[in-house]
Amino acid sequence: MTHTLHLVIHGRVQGVGYRAWCADEAVSRGLSGFVRNRREGTVEAVISGPSEAVAAMLEACRSGPAHAHVERIEEALAEAPPAGTGFRVAATV
Protein backbone atom coordinates (compact mmCIF):
# COMPACT_ATOMS: atom_id res chain seq x y z
CA MET A 1 0.00 0.00 0.00
CA THR A 2 1.35 3.42 -0.98
CA HIS A 3 1.56 6.05 1.73
CA THR A 4 2.40 9.73 1.18
CA LEU A 5 3.44 12.29 3.78
CA HIS A 6 4.06 16.03 3.60
CA LEU A 7 6.76 17.04 6.09
CA VAL A 8 8.02 20.37 7.38
CA ILE A 9 11.26 19.90 9.28
CA HIS A 10 12.25 22.54 11.86
CA GLY A 11 15.62 23.14 13.50
CA ARG A 12 19.15 23.52 12.15
CA VAL A 13 18.31 21.89 8.82
CA GLN A 14 19.66 24.35 6.24
CA GLY A 15 23.33 24.64 5.37
CA VAL A 16 24.07 21.18 6.80
CA GLY A 17 23.43 18.96 3.76
CA TYR A 18 19.92 17.96 4.82
CA ARG A 19 18.38 18.07 1.32
CA ALA A 20 21.12 15.97 -0.32
CA TRP A 21 21.04 13.51 2.59
CA CYS A 22 17.24 13.29 2.38
CA ALA A 23 17.32 12.66 -1.37
CA ASP A 24 19.96 9.93 -0.99
CA GLU A 25 17.97 8.27 1.81
CA ALA A 26 14.72 8.45 -0.17
CA VAL A 27 16.26 7.01 -3.34
CA SER A 28 17.88 4.18 -1.37
CA ARG A 29 14.46 3.33 0.08
CA GLY A 30 12.72 3.43 -3.33
CA LEU A 31 10.60 6.47 -2.45
CA SER A 32 9.32 9.22 -4.71
CA GLY A 33 8.65 12.89 -3.99
CA PHE A 34 10.82 15.93 -3.33
CA VAL A 35 12.71 17.91 -0.71
CA ARG A 36 13.37 21.66 -0.71
CA ASN A 37 14.42 24.55 1.49
CA ARG A 38 11.86 27.14 2.52
CA ARG A 39 12.89 30.75 2.93
CA GLU A 40 11.79 30.86 6.59
CA GLY A 41 14.50 28.31 7.46
CA THR A 42 12.67 24.99 7.39
CA VAL A 43 12.95 22.07 4.99
CA GLU A 44 9.83 20.73 3.25
CA ALA A 45 9.52 17.22 1.87
CA VAL A 46 6.92 14.97 0.30
CA ILE A 47 7.75 11.29 0.61
CA SER A 48 5.72 8.57 -1.07
CA GLY A 49 6.02 4.81 -1.30
CA PRO A 50 5.31 1.61 0.60
CA SER A 51 4.04 2.31 4.12
CA GLU A 52 7.00 0.63 5.83
CA ALA A 53 9.55 2.58 3.77
CA VAL A 54 7.77 5.88 4.43
CA ALA A 55 7.67 5.16 8.17
CA ALA A 56 11.40 4.31 8.16
CA MET A 57 12.18 7.49 6.21
CA LEU A 58 10.19 9.59 8.68
CA GLU A 59 12.22 8.11 11.54
CA ALA A 60 15.46 8.82 9.68
CA CYS A 61 14.34 12.43 9.08
CA ARG A 62 14.04 12.94 12.84
CA SER A 63 17.85 12.72 13.04
CA GLY A 64 19.00 13.81 9.59
CA PRO A 65 22.66 14.12 8.60
CA ALA A 66 25.50 14.53 11.10
CA HIS A 67 25.45 18.35 11.43
CA ALA A 68 21.66 18.77 11.50
CA HIS A 69 19.65 19.31 14.65
CA VAL A 70 15.98 18.51 14.08
CA GLU A 71 13.72 20.18 16.65
CA ARG A 72 10.40 18.93 15.34
CA ILE A 73 8.62 17.66 12.24
CA GLU A 74 5.12 18.66 11.17
CA GLU A 75 3.55 15.81 9.22
CA ALA A 76 0.34 15.49 7.23
CA LEU A 77 -1.08 13.06 4.71
CA ALA A 78 -0.60 14.18 1.11
CA GLU A 79 -1.45 13.17 -2.44
CA ALA A 80 1.04 10.86 -4.10
CA PRO A 81 3.24 12.40 -6.80
CA PRO A 82 2.71 11.13 -10.36
CA ALA A 83 4.03 7.60 -10.88
CA GLY A 84 7.57 7.31 -12.16
CA THR A 85 8.71 10.76 -11.01
CA GLY A 86 11.40 9.52 -8.64
CA PHE A 87 12.77 11.72 -5.87
CA ARG A 88 14.33 15.13 -6.45
CA VAL A 89 15.76 18.18 -4.73
CA ALA A 90 13.44 21.05 -5.70
CA ALA A 91 13.99 24.80 -5.81
CA THR A 92 13.65 26.88 -2.64
CA VAL A 93 10.23 28.44 -2.00
Swiss-Prot record:
Q: What's its EC?
A: 3.6.1.7
Gene Ontology molecular function: acylphosphatase activity
Keyword Hydrolase: yes or no?
Answer: yes
Q: What PROSITE patterns does the database record attribute to this sequence?
A: ACYLPHOSPHATASE_2 (PS00151), ACYLPHOSPHATASE_3 (PS51160)
For the Acylphosphatase-like domain, which residue ranges apply? Answer: 4-91
Could you list this entry's UniProt keywords, alphabetically sorted. Answer: Hydrolase
Family recorded in the similarity comment: Belongs to the acylphosphatase family.
User: Entry's PANTHER family?
Assistant: ACYLPHOSPHATASE (PTHR47268:SF4)
Q: What is this protein called?
A: Acylphosphatase
This protein's gene is called: acyP
